[in-house]
Amino acid sequence: LMADSTNAERPGHTASERTVGNSFVKLFDRAEGKRIIIATFSSNIHRVQQIVNCAVANDRKIAVFGRSMLNVISTAIELGYLKVPDGLIIDLDAMNRFPAEKIVLITTGSQGEPMSALSRMAMNEHRHVTITPNDFIIISANPIPGNEKLVTKVVNELLRAGAEVIYESMYDVHVSGHACQEELKLMLSLIKPKYYIPVHGEYKHLKKQSGLAIDLGMDPNNVIIASIGNVIESDGVDMKITGQVQAG
């Protein structure tokens, strides 16, 4: 078994995505009379669905920014994973036909990526959107380790433009998509793997994850902390690192 280690240091359980939905309901009320811009991960379909639900409840149209966001939303609608009423999503060129307070922008850029839609808005380089004091912006994500400075720069520029900006440390607008300790322990208890390789995280996260498995009774010899490029071999009796290939 290989398992995500990102939240292996966090005790307890990961909060429900419904927490974010409840926050959106309150924030949409708070943003009455303003244009709403929400940046989140394009892969989080449930998060997008909650934004759609709030837009419908508040009689707002939705405009989508960012290639990955457009691709994911269109595919999710096509496959039936995302329920969007006909006519709710409008083309970018049609935004000016609606009052700003009747629009929700869903955009990429929650990690401060320099070429993302939100970053270009913040730097006043987006051809469709100019940030004004009438904008209410929600960054519905936590900075991935290493992206903190990029996100802070975007937030600062949005604030300088006069917008109100909401982010996770201020409000419950994000919950992790990674399992915390109790969920990891439940998974290990249910699956009872013979071999275990913690993945996805810094070394400290992999180390903590391996410790959880050993504390639950796994043989330490069957828990491997691998580095990028390690070759791992198993003969059904034993598992070990046997070599290295060029990677990264």
Residue ranges of model-derived segments:
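Acidic/His-rich, metal-assisted hydrolase cores and their charged scaffolds
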Residues: 1-248
